Amino acid sequence: MKGILGRKVEMTQVFTSAGQLVPVTVVEVLPNTVLQVKTIDSDGYVAVQLGTTDKRVNLVNKPELGHFKKANSNPKRFVKEIRNMQGYELGQVINVSDIFVSGEYVDVTGISKGKGFAGGIKRHNYARGPMAHGSGYHRGIGSMGAIINRIFKSKKMPGHMGNAKRTIQNLEIIAIDQPNNIMLIKGSIPGSKNSFVQIKQNIKGMSSKQAVELLNRNASIEA
């Protein structure tokens, strides 16, 4: 397993050399620092804890500051561990080009946009009731099941929509711009602008393919 932490910037589009338009999400992947290395002997499982994006020292309590100092690192805003990732040393700095290449498929995990309290129609795509004047309901969820003294768990009902951890699988890496710490991922990913995401090696099916050749607009203008 391999992975890295990044920050969602925005969505845009690029063109391939064949003229095909590709929608992409721009992800800023600043250098990640290895803050902790977990092993089976010491922790019972294998994992690497990564951190990215510096934050001010006065925003960190003493236990956290001591944890960062063990890795000889500045305090980090976003810290996550990636299981089954090994082969890295405490304090090592990882760049996006050290982990991934264009054409690979990845799974992206983030916190989805919060929508507040939502009804069954918006939250679960329920059908709307009759809108005629004499109908008994319009946007209600209707029956909640059989006659029983409780509501079953996972029953789809109105409630807080969004603001939950979500993963989108098998997204293609279109391009990596290492000098600018930028990665272009095909399609959309969870979260709002400037939210942090985890980018990990995909775990299902899709294998890497040849990288897409993008259109060089500067060359077109000069011609």
Swiss-Prot record:
Name used for this protein in its record: Large ribosomal subunit protein uL3
GO CC aspect terms: cytosolic large ribosomal subunit
Pfam families: Ribosomal_L3
UniProt KW rRNA-binding keyword: yes
PANTHER family: 50S RIBOSOMAL PROTEIN L3, LARGE RIBOSOMAL SUBUNIT PROTEIN UL3C
PROSITE patterns from the UniProt entry: RIBOSOMAL_L3 (PS00474)
Family to which this protein belongs: Belongs to the universal ribosomal protein uL3 family.
InterPro entries: Ribosomal_uL3, Ribosomal_uL3_bac/org-type, Ribosomal_uL3_CS, Transl_B-barrel_sf
GO terms (BP aspect): translation
NCBIfam families: L3_bact
Subunit annotation: Part of the 50S ribosomal subunit. Forms a cluster with proteins L14 and L19.
Organism: Mycoplasma mycoides subsp. mycoides SC (strain CCUG 32753 / NCTC 10114 / PG1)
GO molecular function: rRNA binding; structural constituent of ribosome
Superkingdom classification of source: Bacteria
Function field: One of the primary rRNA binding proteins, it binds directly near the 3'-end of the 23S rRNA, where it nucleates assembly of the 50S subunit.
Keywords per UniProt: Ribonucleoprotein, Ribosomal protein, RNA-binding, rRNA-binding
